[in-house]
């Protein structure tokens, strides 16, 4: 039985103090032939700080990792990093569409939330889109396995 695991949009909420625990748990959950995919917002440069406004109003306790912060923890867990994909502009487009959808439904939103929330959410979506377009924010997809022979040598298998 192959046990594959996927984590989407969760790793940025784990916190650096728990990275090793996270990857150790991924290792424990995989069979010897299992593969894990970790999909997370990340930064292309060195580790940094979370924007204070984002931390206070949008993602309390969240942290955007640099790839350099994760790889050493992957290695210590016994997992092999078998592939990394860096999606540079995809999430900017996602945020842009979310903002359009937000305004397409603004009357419904205002029935539930006040004006302050609406302004904050617009600011979050707009500033995040700009960050993905103009700064070092990206999305990483890390493919991990216990056994590097489990994963094909190229990405051609994804096209089948």
Where are these predicted regions, by residue range?
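A short glycine-rich, Lys/Arg-flanked "PGG" loop and its adjoining helix->strand segment in the class I
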Residues: 20-35
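Serine-hydrolase catalytic core recognition
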Residues: 19-22, 38-40, 46
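A conserved beta-strand element that flanks and buttresses the S-adenosyl-L-methionine
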Residues: 6-11
